[in-house]
């Protein structure tokens, strides 16, 4: 029996540990209070844009370093999983991210291998502020605190850094950044997506007027480069009551080579898109006139291909936009004026275009009616721009899609002529024979 006492005591201890996990042992020393504020350095890290769409915006993190204990950790709020459940949640507008910590040097090597800029700004905080921010970051990594619901413009991996810095500064950062921003969120999106014009147009198409409203500099800091810029300009009140720069020093760990810089202003694609839209619509009219004159297969097949192309390029996004508005929590897609330009009806041009290519007798008339509806909706969307509530900045999409729709409606109306001519010729021949 005496021998069982130590064993029972040990088992009881293990049960207590299981019931109350010892989170303290998982915390960095600045999370437990072991680190002293005067021994800490806090760095805002800005990573430049990358190659894939998700990395076009860049990325940001915070590094906490304890010089006395020779420890450093990088805190990254951009962690997410590519499993099936994540894709489903993202499709429904509920994407869950989390924060994790990692080795700063290993992270820097990784971004260097991707040829992405790595820039550091050491924050000029008081020892008490450094200790507070370090503890905040360390506690956020704990399993019960780490997850958050990602929102691209208002709650992302950079706004979390901004909010943490502002908290330890007593709201000074928010106050200093409360002035008007340089441009709308849509203009920022267009700047950063300039590296991929087709994807830029798709994103432009999917987003409503939420991102066209005036914003503050604080809201612009959803972008890593904007937060970096604003922190560099910031003056904060120090322990002596005097204002000091928030950035004590800048460190460039790596500068990318051969990567295009993000433009300061959004690109002006409107005139180019208008020319493309007019060329597409005019081309459809030209094919219809050719078909009317010759009655050959080539113009019919080419006109069918134009319909198939339009259905693929604009019909699928139009259908997706409608579904996102009606059935998901992607509020940035709601009540989108681009549905006047492309919508689920637009997708019908795909099968009808295929039927036209294969010589269906009913396809031309069905397409004509469809295009009259689509062109009418596009014109209606343009006319409604006169009302204040229709304020979405979709002019470049109007310039591209509306001439196409009007041109196709005209082309399919003209395509009725050959059938009418053939019928009148047949009637004349029968009368002559009689």
What are these regions (language model features)?
Residues 1-9:
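Bacterial N-terminal signal peptides that target proteins for export
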Residues 25-42:
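A eukaryotic "domain-start" boundary segment
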Residues 38-116, 333-334:
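Glycine-rich catalytic cores of cysteine/serine-nucleophile enzymes that process amide/ester linkages
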Residues 125-138:
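A structural motif
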């Amino acid at each position: 029996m005496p021998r069982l006492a130590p064993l029972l005591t040990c088992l009881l201890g293990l049960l207590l540990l299981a019931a109350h996990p010892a989170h303290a042992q998982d915390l960095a020393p600045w999370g437990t209070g072991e680190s002293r504020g005067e021994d800490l350095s806090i760095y805002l890290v800005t990573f430049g844009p990358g190659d894939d769409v998700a990395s076009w915006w860049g990325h940001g993190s915070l590094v906490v370093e304890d010089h006395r204990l020779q420890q450093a950790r990088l805190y990254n709020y951009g962690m997410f999983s590519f499993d099936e459940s994540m894709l489903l949640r993202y499709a429904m507008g509920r994407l869950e991210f989390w924060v994790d910590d990692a080795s700063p040097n290993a992270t820097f090597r990784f971004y260097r291998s991707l040829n992405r800029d790595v820039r550091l700004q050491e924050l000029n905080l008081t020892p008490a502020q450094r200790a507070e921010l370090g503890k905040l970051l360390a506690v956020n990594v704990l399993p019960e605190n780490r997850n958050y619901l990602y929102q691209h413009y208002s709650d992302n991996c950079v706004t979390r850094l901004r909010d943490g810095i502002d908290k330890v500064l007593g709201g000074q950062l928010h106050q200093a950044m409360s002035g008007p921003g340089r441009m709308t969120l849509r203009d920022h999106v267009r700047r950063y997506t300039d590296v991929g014009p087709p994807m830029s147009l798709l994103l432009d198409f999917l987003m409503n007027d939420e991102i066209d409203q005036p914003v503050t500099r604080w809201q612009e800091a959803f972008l890593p480069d904007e937060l970096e810029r604003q922190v560099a300009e910031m003056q904060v009140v120090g322990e002596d009551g005097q204002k000091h720069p928030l950035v004590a020093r800048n460190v460039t760990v790596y500068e990318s080579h051969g990567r295009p810089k993000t433009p300061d202003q959004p690109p002006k694609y409107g005139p180019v898109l208008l020319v493309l839209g007019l060329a597409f619509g005019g081309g459809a009219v030209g094919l219809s006139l050719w078909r009317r004159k010759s009655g050959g297969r080539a113009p019919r097949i080419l006109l069918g291909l134009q319909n198939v192309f339009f259905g693929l390029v604009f019909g699928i996004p139009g259908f997706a936009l409608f579904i996102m508005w009606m059935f998901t929590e992607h509020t940035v897609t709601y009540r989108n004026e681009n549905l006047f330009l492309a919508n689920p009806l637009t997708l019908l041009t795909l099968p009808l275009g295929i039927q036209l290519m294969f010589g269906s007798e009913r396809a031309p008339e069905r397409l004509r009616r469809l295009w009259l509806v689509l062109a009418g909706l596009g014109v209606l969307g343009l006319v409604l721009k006169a009302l204040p509530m229709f304020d979405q900045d979709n002019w470049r999409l109007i310039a591209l899609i509306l001439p196409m729709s009007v041109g196709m409606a005209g082309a399919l109306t003209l395509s009725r002529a050959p059938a009418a001519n053939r019928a009148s010729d047949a009637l004349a021949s029968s009368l002559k024979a009689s």
